[in-house]
Amino acid sequence: MVRLCTTNFLAYRATGSPLLLLYFYLCSLSSVKSSAAASYTNASDYVLRNVFEHSDQCYKDSFVYVRADDKKSDPFITYSTTKECSERLKKNDLPEKLPTCPPGLIDLELKPVYVPKSQISYPYANLNISVTAHSSVDTIAFRLECLSASDGSDVYCSNSKAMYINGVKEWPCRGIHLSSRVQYPTRFSYSCFRLTSFSVYAINATILPQKCRVSTIMTAPYFDDMFPEILVDPTTNQSIITKTDPFWAPMLSADFSDKNAIWVRLGKAERAECETMVVNVYKEHDDDSQKVTFLEILTVKCPETAVKWENQKAGRYLLTAYVPIRGCKFYCEKKERGCRQCLRTHLNLVIYKNRASLSWLALQKFKDYGFEIFIAVVVLLILIIVLAVTGFGYVLWRDKVRSREVRNIALTEFVKVMIVYADDNDLHTDCVKKLVENLRNCASCDPVFDLEKLITAEQIVPSRWLVDQISSLKKFIIVVSDCAEKILDTEASETHQLVQARPFADLFGPAMEMIIRDATHNFPEARKKYAVVRFNYSPHVPPNLAILNLPTFILPEQFAQLTAFLHNVEHTERANVTQNISEAQIHEWNLCASRMMSFFVRNPNWLETRWKPKDELAALHLKRQSPVIVPIQTEEDRIAASIKYNLVPPQALVDSDDEDDVDLQPHASHQNQPLILLPPEQCGPDSDSDSESDSSSESESESDNEGEDPKTIVVKKS
């Protein structure tokens, strides 16, 4: 039937008229009825028509579509005999084994067909073979090959003369040749191959010009089991079939179109009903015994007819299919009463190569050769352990040999290193001086020591000097002591501070702030730049300094290791590093440390005199005293008073030889004026800012300030 509606009628009808709507309805209805399967109609911009016609009703399920306006004839050629089909295939010189067709190219479908009783035969079953092509192909051909038969009733398994062509046995074959004008999908179907119960067939569909093949192995149960009378009787109502629910067995086939799995397909009578169909899988033993091993159960939910059987190894298998109807069981014990055994279909299957994923194959290999793999793993582990022990022993032996080697390293460069320490007391400073002395004399170092740089040079500003040294030097030695531990304690430093005992403030705190800030920015470089040293009497490294994990040395025992660090000499911790430092120098250094330890014993509370609260160290307020009236009558009296009270001498005394007349005049006017002398201000952290404001406090006796060294004298008029 042609699915084409002409437009001549539309030219005379207005849009939306009832006749126009009726016309489109009739066209669409005829289009649906024109195809055996509407789902295969090509939804394109033009109308197609099925041009497949054959006098043999065995091809009735086939269809070939071309465009409706295609007037050319012969869009296809059928090969209706085995001879024609075989000759077409032989022209392409095909090998015995062809590759499997790619997915999506064709579909191979099998189903049983019931043929009712006639005047010349009893009821029997045919096999319907359908190949649907979804892409452009040239030729579709399929053969039916009998693999085995239960008896001689199967005509295809016999050696009758009808099976031979020119003396060569040819299996039944049917095919079709398609022109380039054919539209897809296209189906070629043949339903007249006789199906014999319990026979096993192989159906091979060959596609040209792709030269590929799809193979299926199938079998059928007993005829009456597959087609119960109630299912094939046309007079029986479907409701009666549903109510009766007769027992039946399915047709069973194995599709090899998937390279990594097998599709198990089940066929049934057209009106047979079910909920599920079950396939039991058994593995046959390789020793040709009758024993089988149960593997798994495959379940197909109706109306589906296929299930994917994945991960199989090469070997022989037995597939048993049945339909659990009305509580029937696959197997009934002999003593079990009221048990009904389901009707079953058996298929012996041979898989010549593995059809499974790589992961599953690897797991199966492990299971099959588990003991051998275990032995191999144990041997490998033993070998690794032996190699590890051998390597470890070699490393120990090498280190032992190297430890016996003596490396003489000449310290040719002078390293400039800064000593960062806290001013605990004079005895501690003596130990630091010994460190400086030994660094200079025995370690080829140029120590930067504040007592040498700041006290001898009055023009240097301590804070600026500290910043210059930290920004320019590459090596620093941090000396840990009791006062240093207090200064590094953040909470203690908020309320207490170190009593100043030198002309300049203690620089340990500011120096450590800059060092810690620099070290936290780059830990690897800090470990090469900063070193922490402790004397025998020193406390442990404070936690906030120990967290930096800087190299730490105990002096004088590890003075050689400290020297190696300062000169960047690489060595292991177990290396024995020695240095040309005399025993006498070590002895003197130990004596300094011993004096410090003895001082701790004699003065257990010495730290309280050096570490005091900040409010006690505030600037001492100067209190006004009774003025001391010094009568000055002459210039000589003024000079004498200046010398006695550390005043700057009068200008007349300095320049008396050159400027007597000029300088004596301003002083002459004050000869008879008395002067008031105030005691000097005491040094304190806030003395500069508070001295003048606090000078008005109430007076105290002169005895309060006896013994103090006057540093500043303020001269005021009375």
From Swiss-Prot:
Membrane topology value: Single-pass type I membrane protein
Stretches assigned to the SEFIR domain: 414-564
Gene Ontology biological process terms from the UniProt entry: interleukin-17-mediated signaling pathway; positive regulation of locomotion; sensory processing
Chain intervals for the UniProt region annotation (Disordered): 654-718
Top-rank lineage group of the source organism: Eukaryota
Tissue-wise expression: Expressed in most neurons, and in pharyngeal muscle.
Pfam family, one: SEFIR
Cleavable signal peptide: 1-30
Topological domain spans for side Extracellular: 36-372
Comp. bias regions, Acidic residues: 687-707
Known function: Forms a receptor complex together with receptor ilcr-1, which upon activation acts as a modulator of neuronal activity. Binding of the ligand ilc-17.1 to the ilcr-1/2 receptor complex triggers a signaling cascade that activates the downstream signaling components actl-1, pik-1 and nfki-1, and results in increased neuronal activity in RMG interneurons in response to input from oxygen-sensing neurons. This leads to increased animal movement and promotes aggregation behavior.
Glycan attachment positions: N42, N128, N204, N237
Alphabetical keyword list: Cell membrane, Glycoprotein, Membrane, Receptor, Signal, Transmembrane, Transmembrane helix
Residue ranges of the TM segments: 373-393
Sample GO molecular function, one term: interleukin-17 receptor activity
Subcellular location as annotated: Cell membrane
Residue intervals on the Cytoplasmic side: 394-718
Protein's name in the database: Interleukin cytokine receptor-related protein 2
Matches recorded under PANTHER family: INTERLEUKIN CYTOKINE RECEPTOR-RELATED PROTEIN 2, INTERLEUKIN-17 RECEPTOR
